[in-house]
Amino acid sequence: MRAIGILVILTIIISANGSRSAGIEMNVTLAAASPNRASQQGELAIIINKSNPNDNISLAELKQYFLAERSNWSPGGAKVRVVMREPGRPEREAVLNLIYRMNEKGFTSYFLAKKFTGELVDGPRQQNSTPDVIKFISYVPGAIGYVRADEVDASVKVLRVGGLAPGEPGYMIKL
């Protein structure tokens, strides 16, 4: 995180005889972070298992994977396992709006209907924390999910969407 701040405190003391004395106390904090990291705040990264050979997919393909319209990765062939955050999280709301193009009720109805008709055995897996999402994806070869871009670690791979990664101009998966 980028933190640049300067705190200046001016102290003026007036004594009983009317003479004045002044003092200045300065506290300077400078910390730098990569500009790309700072620009990722508020963006979501689509993450996959490191063994997945894919590096880039279109938004339409991403939607097909998330909607369980494609059950296996191409190329690679691993079974797709979508991981979602729990209802009410801003990350989940953003994904429902931007990728699924539905609200929570529509999402629930969609997957219940797929299960009822036998098209799908189970829907997206739910995880209650970012570390849990990352851990699941790092262990399951076909897993795909999302986390805040500034919380990604080296145990997973960030998937480019439409040729763009978080922090690049035009990247559209944001909170």
Each language-model region and where it sits:
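Bacterial N-terminal signal peptides
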Residues: 6-15
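Exported/periplasmic ABC-transporter solute-binding proteins
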Residues: 24-175
